[in-house]
């Protein structure tokens, strides 16, 4: 494995040619303050102890690494292990980062938070930590996503957050990020922007990756305990890329195949997809340079996925870099492939995954049978499917797989 891989952003915040700080001048003081505060917190054993305390006592970490015996047998394939981020408090990986950033904001003396959310999971995680630490929170959420995720909207409001509907553009995650950034610019003195994915201006991609890396660190120690060796392949779904970077990062310099699974929506032969790597090109959005779905004139295109958490038109700068150097392989799954995998997996394992996670499972169902039965695959179940029950029900009813 190539040990020359760049695993930290350079002093200007770039991974290779991706990353940076493409923000208005008015935001630079806040960005500089955040970078300095994070560097100090990262080196402070007391901050790390506090983070570990809440991850253990509040979130419920470590999450299990479960051998999927029935699923493995049904595929007649390599051994499949599940990293159970669905078992975290709030039901997804998002809490790992929300908790870390809330502690950081508290350390910086910020009493208010602003966040964006797509599927609502990051919004719920942010509202949860805001309630825990007695902070005010404003969440921007696309109007389309609000329709798809009513349950999570109510959860956020019950937890005390103010949810603001974003009607601009497509009314999805990308538009919510725009509004959250605008809000931060005008409230920068007392507000921390709790960014939910591994993107945005430096130092956000690094901060989010570091707080999510607990996933990969646990996988490493758990698989060594269970199997006495590292896995042959690791698979995670990818939107902006936070669960995937947290899963992959501790293995970047190991001899382990890493697969990120993008959302192909209605198919990679249509324009209704979220294939930032698969069909995109480098560009700048939301303060960072990364792969984007854009036209020849550099206009960012609308992303589509049945999963509200994957319909983002970009993929974080570190993933963009790992794609270019060939360290991570990017595959995809369509809406139909993901839903079929979700139904199949649920029937075998008694675990209903989030539709996001089902994209990763769809690729596992293609990959695992091509490997030997002695091989080991780990797939990150990034969240549970409670939030998606209405979408799943509609999908099955429309296809005669369930009664209306």
Curated annotation (Swiss-Prot):
Reaction catalysis annotation: (1S,2R)-1-C-(indol-3-yl)glycerol 3-phosphate + L-serine = D-glyceraldehyde 3-phosphate + L-tryptophan + H2O
Keywords: Amino-acid biosynthesis, Aromatic amino acid biosynthesis, Lyase, Pyridoxal phosphate, Tryptophan biosynthesis
Protein task: The beta subunit is responsible for the synthesis of L-tryptophan from indole and L-serine.
Record EC number: 4.2.1.20
A Pfam family it matches: PALP
Molecular function terms from GO: tryptophan synthase activity
Protein's UniProt name: Tryptophan synthase beta chain
